[in-house]
Amino acid sequence: MDTTVRNIIVTLALIAGLLSGAAAAADLPRPPTDKDRCAVCGMYVHKYPNWIATIVFEDGSQVFFDGPKDFFRYALEPQKFKAKGRKVAKLFVTDYYGVKFVDATTAYFVAGSDVMGPMGPELIPLRNREEAETFARDHGGGEVLAFDDVTPAKIPR
Protein backbone atom coordinates (compact mmCIF):
# COMPACT_ATOMS: atom_id res chain seq x y z
CA MET A 1 0.00 0.00 0.00
CA ASP A 2 1.24 3.42 -0.92
CA THR A 3 2.45 5.56 2.03
CA THR A 4 0.08 8.40 1.15
CA VAL A 5 -2.96 6.11 1.10
CA ARG A 6 -1.87 4.53 4.40
CA ASN A 7 -1.46 7.99 5.98
CA ILE A 8 -4.93 9.00 4.79
CA ILE A 9 -6.47 5.81 6.24
CA VAL A 10 -4.67 6.29 9.57
CA THR A 11 -5.72 9.95 9.70
CA LEU A 12 -9.36 9.09 8.96
CA ALA A 13 -9.32 6.37 11.63
CA LEU A 14 -7.92 8.84 14.18
CA ILE A 15 -10.55 11.44 13.30
CA ALA A 16 -13.33 8.85 13.63
CA GLY A 17 -11.99 7.84 17.03
CA LEU A 18 -11.82 11.43 18.21
CA LEU A 19 -15.34 12.16 16.97
CA SER A 20 -16.79 9.11 18.71
CA GLY A 21 -15.08 10.17 21.95
CA ALA A 22 -16.46 13.69 21.58
CA ALA A 23 -19.95 12.31 20.98
CA ALA A 24 -19.71 10.17 24.12
CA ALA A 25 -18.54 13.19 26.14
CA ALA A 26 -21.40 15.27 24.71
CA ASP A 27 -23.86 12.74 26.15
CA LEU A 28 -22.58 13.40 29.68
CA PRO A 29 -23.96 16.21 31.83
CA ARG A 30 -21.95 19.27 32.69
CA PRO A 31 -20.24 19.05 36.07
CA PRO A 32 -21.61 21.26 38.83
CA THR A 33 -20.06 24.62 39.59
CA ASP A 34 -19.34 25.90 43.08
CA LYS A 35 -22.72 27.65 42.95
CA ASP A 36 -24.86 24.56 42.18
CA ARG A 37 -26.90 23.32 45.13
CA CYS A 38 -28.82 20.13 45.76
CA ALA A 39 -32.37 20.68 44.49
CA VAL A 40 -33.73 18.92 47.60
CA CYS A 41 -31.61 19.89 50.61
CA GLY A 42 -29.67 22.92 49.36
CA MET A 43 -26.14 21.59 50.02
CA TYR A 44 -23.38 22.71 47.64
CA VAL A 45 -22.89 19.60 45.53
CA HIS A 46 -19.38 20.32 44.17
CA LYS A 47 -18.02 19.48 47.64
CA TYR A 48 -19.15 15.86 47.19
CA PRO A 49 -17.95 14.79 43.72
CA ASN A 50 -18.14 11.08 44.57
CA TRP A 51 -21.89 11.36 45.19
CA ILE A 52 -23.24 13.82 42.61
CA ALA A 53 -26.41 12.92 40.74
CA THR A 54 -28.18 15.06 38.16
CA ILE A 55 -31.29 15.29 36.06
CA VAL A 56 -30.93 16.85 32.61
CA PHE A 57 -34.13 18.27 31.16
CA GLU A 58 -35.03 18.45 27.47
CA ASP A 59 -34.39 22.21 27.47
CA GLY A 60 -30.77 21.50 28.51
CA SER A 61 -31.15 22.74 32.08
CA GLN A 62 -29.96 20.56 34.96
CA VAL A 63 -30.67 20.06 38.62
CA PHE A 64 -28.05 18.53 40.90
CA PHE A 65 -28.18 16.39 44.02
CA ASP A 66 -25.64 15.62 46.73
CA GLY A 67 -26.47 11.91 46.49
CA PRO A 68 -28.86 9.32 45.10
CA LYS A 69 -31.36 9.52 47.94
CA ASP A 70 -32.16 13.19 47.24
CA PHE A 71 -32.09 12.42 43.51
CA PHE A 72 -34.78 9.78 44.01
CA ARG A 73 -36.83 11.97 46.34
CA TYR A 74 -36.99 14.55 43.56
CA ALA A 75 -37.45 12.10 40.68
CA LEU A 76 -40.21 10.11 42.39
CA GLU A 77 -42.18 13.12 43.63
CA PRO A 78 -41.39 16.05 41.30
CA GLN A 79 -44.53 17.94 42.32
CA LYS A 80 -42.99 18.51 45.77
CA PHE A 81 -40.16 20.44 44.09
CA LYS A 82 -42.20 22.37 41.52
CA ALA A 83 -40.83 20.18 38.75
CA LYS A 84 -44.01 18.42 37.68
CA GLY A 85 -44.42 18.57 33.92
CA ARG A 86 -40.75 19.27 33.14
CA LYS A 87 -39.57 16.86 30.47
CA VAL A 88 -36.60 14.77 31.54
CA ALA A 89 -33.96 13.96 28.93
CA LYS A 90 -31.39 12.02 31.00
CA LEU A 91 -30.72 10.85 34.53
CA PHE A 92 -27.22 10.38 35.95
CA VAL A 93 -25.65 9.14 39.16
CA THR A 94 -21.98 8.78 40.06
CA ASP A 95 -20.79 5.17 40.01
CA TYR A 96 -19.31 4.36 43.42
CA TYR A 97 -16.27 2.47 42.11
CA GLY A 98 -15.59 4.35 38.86
CA VAL A 99 -16.47 7.81 40.26
CA LYS A 100 -17.92 8.71 36.85
CA PHE A 101 -21.41 9.60 35.72
CA VAL A 102 -23.46 6.61 34.59
CA ASP A 103 -27.01 6.38 33.30
CA ALA A 104 -29.15 6.13 36.43
CA THR A 105 -31.76 4.01 34.66
CA THR A 106 -29.27 1.20 34.05
CA ALA A 107 -27.44 1.48 37.39
CA TYR A 108 -28.08 -0.63 40.49
CA PHE A 109 -28.37 0.72 44.01
CA VAL A 110 -27.39 -0.92 47.29
CA ALA A 111 -29.55 -0.09 50.29
CA GLY A 112 -28.49 -0.66 53.88
CA SER A 113 -24.69 -0.78 53.51
CA ASP A 114 -22.10 0.44 56.00
CA VAL A 115 -21.00 3.21 53.59
CA MET A 116 -22.36 6.65 54.40
CA GLY A 117 -23.00 9.47 51.95
CA PRO A 118 -22.75 13.22 52.62
CA MET A 119 -25.94 13.12 54.71
CA GLY A 120 -25.75 9.68 56.32
CA PRO A 121 -27.24 6.43 55.02
CA GLU A 122 -27.33 6.39 51.24
CA LEU A 123 -28.34 4.32 48.23
CA ILE A 124 -24.97 3.35 46.77
CA PRO A 125 -24.96 3.51 42.95
CA LEU A 126 -23.05 0.91 40.92
CA ARG A 127 -22.87 0.64 37.15
CA ASN A 128 -24.04 -2.99 36.96
CA ARG A 129 -25.67 -5.75 39.01
CA GLU A 130 -22.46 -7.76 39.46
CA GLU A 131 -20.62 -4.83 41.06
CA ALA A 132 -23.67 -4.03 43.19
CA GLU A 133 -23.86 -7.61 44.50
CA THR A 134 -20.11 -7.61 45.26
CA PHE A 135 -20.43 -4.26 47.02
CA ALA A 136 -23.40 -5.53 49.05
CA ARG A 137 -21.41 -8.59 50.19
CA ASP A 138 -18.37 -6.47 51.09
CA HIS A 139 -20.30 -3.69 52.84
CA GLY A 140 -23.21 -5.39 54.56
CA GLY A 141 -25.73 -4.08 52.05
CA GLY A 142 -29.22 -5.36 52.62
CA GLU A 143 -30.73 -5.09 49.17
CA VAL A 144 -29.65 -4.58 45.56
CA LEU A 145 -32.20 -2.50 43.68
CA ALA A 146 -32.61 -1.78 39.98
CA PHE A 147 -33.61 1.79 39.14
CA ASP A 148 -37.30 0.88 38.78
CA ASP A 149 -37.27 -0.93 42.15
CA VAL A 150 -36.48 2.23 44.13
CA THR A 151 -39.62 3.54 45.82
CA PRO A 152 -40.07 6.30 48.41
CA ALA A 153 -40.24 3.60 51.12
CA LYS A 154 -36.79 2.27 50.13
CA ILE A 155 -35.02 5.64 50.30
CA PRO A 156 -32.91 5.90 53.49
CA ARG A 157 -33.91 8.62 55.92
Q: Residues of each region from the PLM?
A:
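Bacterial N-terminal signal peptides
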Residues: I9-S20
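N-terminal secretory signal peptides that target proteins for export/translocation
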Residues: M1-R6
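Thiol/selenol-based redox catalytic cores and closely related redox-interacting motifs
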Residues: K84-F147, A153
